[in-house]
Amino acid sequence: MKKLLLIPIVAILTACSSTHLTPDKAIVVQPLAQATATPERPIKVTVMRDYGAISGGARQYHILDNGKIIASLYSKEMTTYYAEPGNHALSVGFGKNGEDGRINFSEFKLGEEPELHVGWDGVNLYINRMK
């Protein structure tokens, strides 16, 4: 009986977490800022919103880079923006100022193309650099 009870619990917890998104399955949206490369901002940064079935799935997530809103993404969406080399405080949250979310500190270097994934792990928001 205990094992039978575990099946729906595991199913619910699995549905609450996000599933990793790949670029070929993503819906591309334009960034709200820094949409084109410039000599000051040559680094192409891709942000993908992983998708979840229940918890956090319908909410819009706001992506900020050093306090500046870059994009607002729904489930299965991705955006690409251009950033300057150096240290960046990347945050994801439900509010447009990002105070209710998570922060990832990362250094962007010339010649690299960082890829970030944001989503919901069943308990909290996350923002992870994948490359």
Regions found by a protein language model. Name each.
Residues 16-131:
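Short loop/turn and low-complexity linker motifs enriched in small/turn-promoting residues
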